[in-house]
C-alpha cells in the first residue's frame, strides 16, 4: 500500500515539473545598442505557449545620437535631439533551440509608431536567447534586424540585453 502511494506521488510530481514553464507570462525590460549610433529601450509583455514558443507585445523607444557640428563631439543637445522614434508592436517567437535552463527563439514581428513628425512602420527579425534564473526570473540576449518604413533611417541592426520578470 505504501509503495503504491509513493508511486502515485512520484508520478504526480513528475507531471507537475514537466509543465513548469508552459503558458508562463513575463514582463520584459531591455536596453540595447544599434548600428549606427543608436540606443533603444523596450518594455514588453510576453505570453508563453507550448514548447517555449511565445507572443510578445512591446513598446520600444529609439534614440539616434550624432556629433554636434559646432563642438565636434557628442553634446547633450546632439544626443537627445538628433532623431527619436517610438514603436508599438507584436512579435511571434517560435522556439528553435532548447536545453537545460535555457532556450532560443527566432523573433518575427511588426510594429507601428512615430518619429515625432510622421508615422513609421517596422518589420522585425532576430534571435533571442533566454537563460532561466532563480525565482522565475529570466535573462535574455537579443540580436535584431529592423527594417523601418517611412523614415530616413531604413535599416537597424544591433543587440540588446534584459530581464524577464514572472507575472
PLM features: residue spans?
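Cleavable N-terminal export/targeting peptides
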Residues: 1-24, 167
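Short loop/turn motifs that connect adjacent beta-strands in outer-membrane beta-barrel proteins
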Residues: 20-24, 50-54, 96-104, 117, ...
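Short glycine/proline- and aromatic-enriched beta-strand/turn motifs that initiate or cap beta-hairpins
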Residues: 20-65, 69, 164-166
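Flexible, solvent-exposed loop segments that connect beta-strands
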Residues: 22-24, 55-84, 104-106, 112-116
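Residues that define the transmembrane beta-barrel architecture of outer-membrane proteins
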Residues: 23-25, 37-41, 82-88, 102, ...
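Membrane-embedded beta-strand positions of outer-membrane beta-barrel proteins
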Residues: 27-31, 43, 55-59, 88-90, ...
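Residue-level signature of outer-membrane beta-barrel architecture
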Residues: 33, 47, 92-96, 129-131, ...
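Outer-membrane beta-barrel "beta-signal"
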Residues: 154-167
Amino acid at each position: 500500500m505504501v509503495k503504491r502511494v509513493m508511486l502515485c506521488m512520484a508520478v504526480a510530481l513528475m507531471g507537475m515539473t514537466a509543465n513548469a514553464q508552459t503558458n508562463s507570462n513575463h514582463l520584459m525590460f531591455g536596453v540595447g545598442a544599434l548600428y549606427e549610433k543608436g540606443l533603444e529601450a523596450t518594455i514588453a509583455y510576453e505570453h508563453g505557449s507550448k514548447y517555449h514558443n511565445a507572443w510578445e507585445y512591446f513598446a520600444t523607444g529609439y534614440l539616434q545620437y550624432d556629433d554636434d557640428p559646432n563642438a565636434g563631439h557628442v553634446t547633450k543637445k546632439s544626443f537627445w535631439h538628433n532623431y527619436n522614434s517610438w514603436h508599438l508592436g507584436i512579435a511571434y517567437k517560435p522556439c528553435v533551440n532548447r536545453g537545460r535552463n535555457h532556450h532560443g527563439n527566432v523573433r518575427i514581428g511588426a510594429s507601428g509608431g512615430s518619429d515625432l513628425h510622421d508615422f513609421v512602420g517596422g518589420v522585425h527579425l532576430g534571435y533571442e536567447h533566454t537563460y532561466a534564473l532563480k525565482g522565475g526570473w529570466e535573462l535574455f540576449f537579443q540580436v535584431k534586424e529592423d527594417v523601418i518604413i517611412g523614415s530616413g533611417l531604413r535599416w537597424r541592426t544591433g543587440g540588446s540585453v534584459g530581464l524577464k520578470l514572472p507575472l
